[in-house]
Amino acid sequence: MVPKLFTSPICLLLLLGLMGVEGSLHAKPGQFTWAQWFEIQHINMTSGQCTNAMLVINNYQRRCKNQNTFLLTTFADVVHVCGNPSMPCPSNTSLNNCHHSGVQVPLIHCNLTTPSQNISNCKYTQTTANKFYIVACNNSDPVRDPPQYPVVPVHLDRVI
């Protein structure tokens, strides 16, 4: 007894569940703008150790994120990258709002090594490097983002 593809209620529920999981992996918490969420995820490394720093992000998302990269630079410096020439985004070439950093920055890449349902028990290893990065930038939220930044980073697209 094999369910018919896409007509079975079970297949439909599985498909919707997978779509929901994929959507939630990239969702930002509602209280933040995309720029604020970018800063939390990729600039504000609250601790020098990934396991502790990732706890901040994981608390907002209520799950252990598989990996994350922290750029050891300032938000203002990343905003400045948004002024570099636009290019297609490597992760989605139909988007043309990406910008290459032009200079390497120190960064820390965190990789989940011990997943857990309890986010306090998730453990990460970290790798340090100096690399270029590519960010996607959009117009800022005129009400909630700093007014001195009309264009802001919203997504770390690639580290190279």
Swiss-Prot record:
What the entry lists under SUPFAM superfamilies is as follows: RNase A-like (SSF54076)
Question: Which cysteine pairs are covalently linked by disulfides here?
Answer: C50-C110, C64-C122, C82-C137, C89-C98
Q: Name one GO cellular component term.
A: lysosome
* Assembly and interaction partners: Interacts with and forms a tight 1:1 complex with RNH1. Dimerization of two such complexes may occur.
This protein's UniProt keywords: Disulfide bond, Endonuclease, Glycoprotein, Hydrolase, Lyase, Lysosome, Nitration, Nuclease, Signal
Which catalysed reactions does the entry list for this protein? an [RNA] containing cytidine + H2O = an [RNA]-3'-cytidine-3'-phosphate + a 5'-hydroxy-ribonucleotide-3'-[RNA]; an [RNA] containing uridine + H2O = an [RNA]-3'-uridine-3'-phosphate + a 5'-hydroxy-ribonucleotide-3'-[RNA]
| Entry superkingdom | Eukaryota
- Can you supply a Gene Ontology BP term from the record? defense response to virus
Quote the EC number: 4.6.1.18
Q: Where in the cell is it found?
A: Lysosome; Cytoplasmic granule
InterPro entries per record: RNaseA, RNaseA-like_dom_sf, RNaseA_AS, RNaseA_domain
Gene3D superfamilies, A to Z: Ribonuclease A-like domain
Annotated family: Belongs to the pancreatic ribonuclease family.
Q: Which residues are glycosylated?
A: W34, N44, N92, N111, N118, N138
Q: What is this protein called?
A: Non-secretory ribonuclease
Q: Which top EC class is named for this enzyme in its record? A: lyase
Alphabetized GO MF terms: lyase activity; nucleic acid binding; ribonuclease A activity
One matching Pfam family is RnaseA
Q: What does the record give as the function of this protein?
A: This is a non-secretory ribonuclease. It is a pyrimidine specific nuclease with a slight preference for U. Cytotoxin and helminthotoxin. Possesses a wide variety of biological activities.
